[in-house]
Amino acid sequence: MNEKKNLLNGYIVSNKMNKSAVVIVERKIKHSIYKKFIKKRTKLCIHDEKNICNIGDIVTIRECRPISKTKSWILVNILEKSIV
C-alpha cells in the first residue's frame, strides 16, 4: 500500500468553493506528424482542507481516492504565492 502516487504541478484558477479549488495542469506533447511541441491543459478539482489557496498560486497536487464526484486530487504544498 506504499505505492508512489502521481504528483503534478499547476496553478489555481478558481477558489470560490469551500475546501476546493480548480487547478490547470499544463503539459507538452510532440505532434506525431509535424514533430512540433503542443501545449495541452487539463482542469482538475482539488481538495484544499484549510482554504489556503489563492488564484494564481503555483501548487503541487497528489492523486488520492475519490473525495466527491469530481475531486480525486489533494493539495500537497504551495510552491509560489501569487502577488494579488
UniProtKB/Swiss-Prot annotation:
Top-rank taxon of the source lineage equals Bacteria
What is a biological process (GO) this protein takes part in?
translation
One protein family per Pfam: Ribosomal_S17
Name the protein family.
Belongs to the universal ribosomal protein uS17 family.
Stated role: One of the primary rRNA binding proteins, it binds specifically to the 5'-end of 16S ribosomal RNA.
Provide the assembly information: Part of the 30S ribosomal subunit.
Q: Read off the PANTHER family from this record.
A: 40S RIBOSOMAL PROTEIN S11 FAMILY MEMBER (PTHR10744), SMALL RIBOSOMAL SUBUNIT PROTEIN US17M (PTHR10744:SF1)
Q: Which named protein is this? A: Small ribosomal subunit protein uS17
What gene is behind this protein? rpsQ
